[in-house]
Amino acid sequence: MAAAQVKNEKIGNPKSNRRRRKKRRTEDFSSDSESSSSSSSDESMDDAAEEPKPIKETKSINIDDIDIDSDKETDVNSQEKQNSLRPEPLSNETHEKLSNIKLTTSKLTSVGGSSKNSNIDINQVKKTLAKDKDQLNNEYLMLMASSFSNDLDELRKKPDFTDKSLVLLAKTLQSGSNMFDEETLNAILEQ
């Protein structure tokens, strides 16, 4: 086989060169006394072809035999940290003092008992927000219609422009307000 590789080298086949280099690398690992020059590696390759060297058998390593203590160490360290961060238990005297402290009350805490009133308030707030949003969308539509009035006039003159086209165009312009948050939309409308 070595003779076949020499013939391939003379031809200039790049695949054989790659294979030969690969083989050289594996032999370089097996012998430490060889130099890295190409002439000495060629000689060592010829020697290897003549005398097969016995491969040292590596003892198979069983993963179960490996003892890993790092998990145990981290568990111990984390328990120590948790113990140091835990507050000391409160005495009975401290519990009594804490229970005697009166909590402050406000209008919100006193109203919390009536759930019907809070539901009505929430519904009213939702309705008010919906009205304000509709009003804001309509104002945005008027702003866009005035900005694009010349373009809209040209579209109306087209033969394929119908009432449905007008409604579709108005909804499209109005839905453009959804890309802004309310503060930005208010700022645009105020300009």
Swiss-Prot record:
Q: Which organism is it from?
A: Debaryomyces hansenii (strain ATCC 36239 / CBS 767 / BCRC 21394 / JCM 1990 / NBRC 0083 / IGC 2968) (Yeast)
A biological process from GO:
ribosomal large subunit assembly
What does the function comment of this entry state? Required for efficient biogenesis of the 60S ribosomal subunit.
State the Pfam families in the record.
Answer: Rsa3
The UniProt keywords, alphabetically, are:
Nucleus, Ribonucleoprotein, Ribosome biogenesis
User: Which family is this sequence assigned to?
Assistant: Belongs to the RSA3 family.
List where in the cell it is found.
Nucleus, Nucleolus
Summary of subunit composition and partner proteins: Associates with nucleolar pre-ribosomal particles.
**In which residue ranges is the amino acid composition biased (Basic and acidic residues)?**
50-59
Tell me if Nucleus is a UniProt keyword of this record.
yes
A GO cellular-component term linked to this record: nucleolus
Protein's UniProt name: Ribosome assembly protein 3
Q: Where is the composition biased (Polar residues)?
A: 76-85
User: In which broad location class does this protein mainly occur, judging by the first location in its UniProt entry?
Assistant: nucleus
Please list the residue ranges that the record marks as compositionally biased, kind Low complexity: 32-42
> Which residue intervals make up region (Disordered)?
1-101
List the PANTHER family. Answer: RIBOSOME ASSEMBLY PROTEIN 3
